[in-house]
Curated annotation (Swiss-Prot):
Membrane topology: Multi-pass membrane protein
Protein name (record): Fluoride-specific ion channel FluC
Record's subcellular location: Cell membrane
Residue ranges of the TM segments: 4-24, 39-59, 71-91, 99-119
Mechanisms controlling activity: Na(+) is not transported, but it plays an essential structural role and its presence is essential for fluoride channel function.
Keywords, ordered alphabetically: Cell membrane, Ion channel, Ion transport, Membrane, Metal-binding, Sodium, Transmembrane, Transmembrane helix, Transport
Length: 128
């Protein structure tokens, strides 16, 4: 029964994260156009920032239970961030001759995601 409860916790978080990613993609396409996958980039950067913050905060805090941490990280952040979409969009750009955009997409997604995990960790240390 415990494993089923944990699966439901992750599933609910995944639903919320994936829904948020969808809304971010709609917002990005409307506001930034469709020439570059800004929605995926924003979702990945936001997810990196939040997971860095949550993981750092939860190390020394009793405020986040193990179930809440699972809900937030594996669930919401797992549904929000998307390596498969990033990979597909990058390959599509590269195979369609958009080498510059494809390389920019790789650099921005990987570089910003790594950077924002560190920023999230530092924010958690500063705030808590």
């Amino acid at each position: 029964m415990q494993k089923l409860l944990l699966a439901l916790i992750v599933g609910l978080g995944g639903f919320l994260g994936a829904s948020l990613r969808y809304l971010i993609s709609i917002f990005a396409a409307k506001n930034f156009g469709g020439n570059f996958p800004y929605g995926t980039l924003i979702a990945n950067i936001l997810g990196a920032l939040l997971i860095g913050f949550i993981m750092e905060f939860s190390m020394d805090s009793a405020l986040i239970s193990s179930n809440m941490k699972l809900f937030l990280t594996t669930g919401i952040m797992g549904g929000l961030t998307t390596f498969s979409t990033f990979s597909y969009e990058t390959i599509s750009m590269l195979t369609n001759g958009n080498m510059t955009l494809g390389i920019e997409n790789i650099i921005l997604n990987l570089g910003c995601s790594l950077l924002f995990v560190v920023i999230g960790q530092k924010l958690a240390r500063i705030l808590f």
